[in-house]
């Protein structure tokens, strides 16, 4: 077993797995270090709702075999309304998806080391040259990539990670069977992915039901402990309590039962990234962070960050001098903002405003969605300041002012 590689990747999630897949396909010597054991992977990191769309499926050639259910629509709910829109998608079996990434990279020659907990970088001359794991084990490479998510042991050691606790979103998800997907008074969620804005269920966040076929669905709650959460939270409630409260009060769960062993927990940070690279090093995926701030979609963004990191590494290692300096790898930062998360500042600002709005305002938002043209909705969702401004009402001025105040003070 060699201890010198072209690239070391810490973490085998969607970002790390895709980076390994692309680099191995290009013929580089790649080593992936993954904390979990091979037999259990990914039992402790199986934390994604795993909803995605055809653009992602096609861009990364994700096979149908890892899809639980193909969906036809997306649904947005408020406390008293719902909005349907035709948007084909797919709900993945996340564990199968992550194992597929491993198989793809290994088939092209990548080496995976499971039971390998990364602890800190190996430094020479002020630059990272390798990784220490499992206490005293060492491995070296020209380029090191941190794809470990919020734990970020390498990025933190290199002072590239400023993940803030107050920007951390936490989520919990169960899988249910026996669901009633279309009771009276509710939209039909058959073959749909639904997000619900309702502070009674998810103060400062959202809840979801993703149909996974038959009478089964993924059901979860996610929120940030933000201004919206502080203003609307129920005293003493944990995130588990909110999910239980929802499932006990919503008729869609009247005859539903949790599927044993199908519980997922996780967290991600909803904030602007800082610098993402330095000499011989890049941080990708939720280490950065990368999840879409508005709707929480992470698979596409993380895989794209892995892909642009792989492209950056390919460029640096193809150079006859193998230039992996900070100035060369800074191309990754540029590609991230151009291709992974364009207009991320606008989407973050819109997200912070959204979660400060009241339940009554959520009902009015859905009224607007029913009457506004698709072109305006697409532009607003894409982060267009003009389209976003045109959706504001007079009552939103106080939310705009408070969000702007906090935005610039932080």
Swiss-Prot record:
Entry's Gene Ontology molecular function annotations: oxidoreductase activity
PANTHER family tied to this protein: DIGERANYLGERANYLGLYCEROPHOSPHOLIPID REDUCTASE, GERANYLGERANYL DIPHOSPHATE REDUCTASE
Record's keyword terms, sorted: FAD, Flavoprotein, Lipid biosynthesis, Lipid metabolism, Oxidoreductase, Phospholipid biosynthesis, Phospholipid metabolism
Catalytic activity entry: a 2,3-bis-O-phytanyl-sn-glycerol 1-phospholipid + 8 A = a 2,3-bis-O-(geranylgeranyl)-sn-glycerol 1-phospholipid + 8 AH2; 2,3-bis-O-(phytanyl)-sn-glycerol 1-phosphate + 8 A = 2,3-bis-O-(geranylgeranyl)-sn-glycerol 1-phosphate + 8 AH2; CDP-2,3-bis-O-(geranylgeranyl)-sn-glycerol + 8 AH2 = CDP-2,3-bis-O-(phytanyl)-sn-glycerol + 8 A; archaetidylserine + 8 AH2 = 2,3-bis-O-phytanyl-sn-glycero-3-phospho-L-serine + 8 A
A Pfam family that the UniProt record links to this protein: GGR_cat
An annotated GO BP: glycerophospholipid metabolic process
Family statement: Belongs to the geranylgeranyl reductase family. DGGGPL reductase subfamily.
Protein name as it appears in the record: Digeranylgeranylglycerophospholipid reductase
Lineage: superkingdom: Archaea
InterPro entries: Dggglyphlred_Halo, FAD/NAD-bd_sf, Geranylgeranyl_reductase, GGR_cat
Enzyme class label: oxidoreductase
Entry binding sites for FAD: 15, 34, 118, 286, 298-299
EC assignment: 1.3.-.-
Binding site for a 2,3-bis-O-(geranylgeranyl)-sn-glycerol 1-phospholipid: 343, 379
Entry function: Is involved in the reduction of 2,3-digeranylgeranylglycerophospholipids (unsaturated archaeols) into 2,3-diphytanylglycerophospholipids (saturated archaeols) in the biosynthesis of archaeal membrane lipids. Can fully reduce the unsaturated isoprenoid side chains of membrane phospholipids and glycolipids. Is also able to reduce the omega-position isoprene of dolichol phosphate.
